[in-house]
Amino acid sequence: MLTKWDELMCHQLPATMDQVHTDSPEWTERIYVSIYNVRAQDTIFGFGVGQYPNKNVQDGFATVWHRGRQYNFRASRTLRPCVDEVRIGPLSVELLEGLKRFRLKLDENPSSLRIDVEWTATMNPHEEEHDFRESGGRVVQDISRFDQAGRARGILEFGSQSITLDEESWWGHRDRSWGTRRPLRTDATDTRRRPLLHFCSAGRSRSFVTMRSIGVSSNVARANIPI
């Protein structure tokens, strides 16, 4: 399908820009940002978006860990027809300046999390070596990636608290990747696996999404968020 991206002079396939070079369901494009308070060292903020054109899905999350308590938000939507924007309900990423600045937002939603943060690079992006792997003659990983350090300013709200971020105290990094990757599995019967920090939680953590904790007993609140 045609999108505004098809006006750009950067096609690399005889197809519209919403299509990729393979029909593999594991073809994925991701944005991941991690920001932390280097002064107080008591708060970590994570934000991510994934796009899966061959599954017709875009999803995202935001999470804040503050003094032993974690707050989570996750959402997903059908990708098409809105393939030319990074927005899943109240969660969005706005590019302000290529390879330099972007804005992360989480507007009004059923969780206690609210976010409006601008991230600015403090170094040039580092392009990692291409990651290509085969198994049994089949491509299982074929990924390009770059990462970059930066600083952040803006507002974080969670629970009953509001924190103002300034670039002197809030540093972080981002990871940008695209390509075919190994599938992530979340088989609840496999108790050998440990929960991921940004997707599973335990103890006093609060979550406002439907998710599954793996290998731990969890005291997690759940609520579906229709997008």
State each model region's role:
Residues M1-I227:
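Structured soluble/peripheral alpha/beta segments that form catalytic or ligand/cofactor-binding pockets
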